Every structure is written in C-alpha cells, then in structure tokens.
Amino acid sequence: MTIIAAISCVFLFSILCETSALVLPNSTDLLLSNNNFTDIETALAAHLDSAKIPKARRKRYISQNDMIAILDYHNQVRGKVFPPASNMEYMVWDETLAKSAEAWAATCIWDHGPSYLLRFLGQNLSVRTGRYRSILQLVKPWYDEVKDYAFPYPQDCNPRCPMRCYGPMCTHYTQMVWATSNRIGCAIHTCQNMNVWGSVWRRAVYLVCNYAPKGNWIGEAPYKVGVPCSACPPSYGGSCTDNLCFPGVTSNYLYWFK
C-alpha cells in the first residue's frame, strides 16, 4: 500500500489541511502468509535489541495519559468489531516497541521506517499541525477507515499514488484490529520543520505506533468471525474480557513509567 490521502477532509496532493491529521498508507504489508510466526517473533526481538535507540533520554516522547488513551482506544475498537471476532486478543503496551517508535519519530521523516524493522512489525503514522485537545485526534483517523472496509479483505481501499493520492484506504484500521497483534508501543514528537509531501510543516506533531506481531498479511482476514473469545489461543486459559482474549495482567502499561 503506497501513499495516502487525508483524513478530516478530502485531500489531494496539492491541498494540505494543516489543522487536520494526515496518515501515511501502511507500507508494511508482507506478500507471504504468516506461517513462520515463531521465526518472525525471534527475528523481531533480535532486530529491536540491535536497534539504534538512545539508552538515556531527557524525557519520554509520550505522556502516561496519552499512552493510556491510545491503548484503551485500541482495545475498545478491537472489542467492538463487526462481524464479531472469535479470536481477538487484548492489546498491551510494549516498552521496546515504544522505544523503537520513539527513535523513528525523532527523525521527523514522513515515511515508514526504519526499513530493516518493517518486515517484522506493523506501523501506523499520523501527523498534524495546530492545537489539539487529545492524542486521539491523531489516532481516530485510522479507525475512521472502517467505513470503507468490507470484511474480510480490503476491497477498493488502495489509494492511487504517488503523484496524486486519492481514494479510500483501510490498512490502518485493519492493523488496529488484527487479532494476533497484541502488543503496541507509540511515541509522539514535535518536529520544528517536517517535509510532508513537498510542503514544510512548522511544529508538526508526529505520532508513530508500532505493532507486534505485525498484521496486514496479504490474503488473510484480520480476525476469525464467531462468538467472542470462542477461539482464543490456549495460552489465554479461557480468560475473556470485553470480547477480548485476556492475558490476566494486573497492569498493561503503568510499569513503563516506574
């Protein structure tokens, strides 16, 4: 999936809506089925461990409130998919994914990356300028793609790019509700000057969210249809909450801020 149109307004390459969030098409799709899950998870861990992520930071690039809002919103969306999902897993915060998102957000590059990680993780991006009341103003555009999505596969949700980008897109939404993508880590960074499709945006607010295991495997549906929690992986031991296979964790985010 190559480049994307806008969100809160009809967007062409030559028209920038600087007070609205823009999203980049999800270019992290794989051409092969997810048959070697264990190998991919092992490789992802190795690549994240070797990623060039600063060990010491003056401040975190996401607040606790923003992190909780993003995580809770994803689980809310995942628990209310239609048709209902039988194997939708509860999403938890992943510190390593957040650190890798932080490293990429700090580059202020309006593109998916770094390239050596994209084979192993999913990634959603959003950017806006101007004031905003909630971090969800950068996240909800991903969910809004649901109106153009026909389960189980994206139909016409392929924007025609790169010279001009138009047409609906769905891959941000499908990554959000990919059943096995049970970990997320995000970062937000304010870029003083950011090149967004040839236009320099001042003080652009850049959100990067990384997902694992990655979703959007071509030819596969994001989840199985059925009675909620009726097809959860055995590792969940039959635990279910809000239509999600629940891992039984006492906290899925606060430990990162200790």
Swiss-Prot record:
It holds the Pfam family CAP. Glycans are attached at N26, N36, N124. Residues 22-60 form a propeptide. The keyword Ribosomal protein does not apply. Keywords: Developmental protein, Glycoprotein, Protease inhibitor, Secreted, Signal. Residues 71-211 form the SCP domain. The keyword Secreted applies. GO terms for cellular component: extracellular space. It is found in: Secreted. Induction: Up-regulated by Noggin/NOG and retinoic acid. May be a direct retinoic acid target. Residues 1-21 form the signal peptide. It comes from the Eukaryota. InterPro entries: Allrgn_V5/Tpx1_CS (IPR018244), CAP_dom (IPR014044), CAP_sf (IPR035940), CRISP-related (IPR001283), PI15_CAP (IPR047832). Its main location: secreted. GO terms for molecular function: peptidase inhibitor activity. Was named SugarCrisp after the breakfast cereal. Serine protease inhibitor which displays weak inhibitory activity against trypsin. May play a role in facial patterning during embryonic development. Belongs to the CRISP family. This is Peptidase inhibitor 15. It comes from Gallus gallus (Chicken). The gene is PI15.
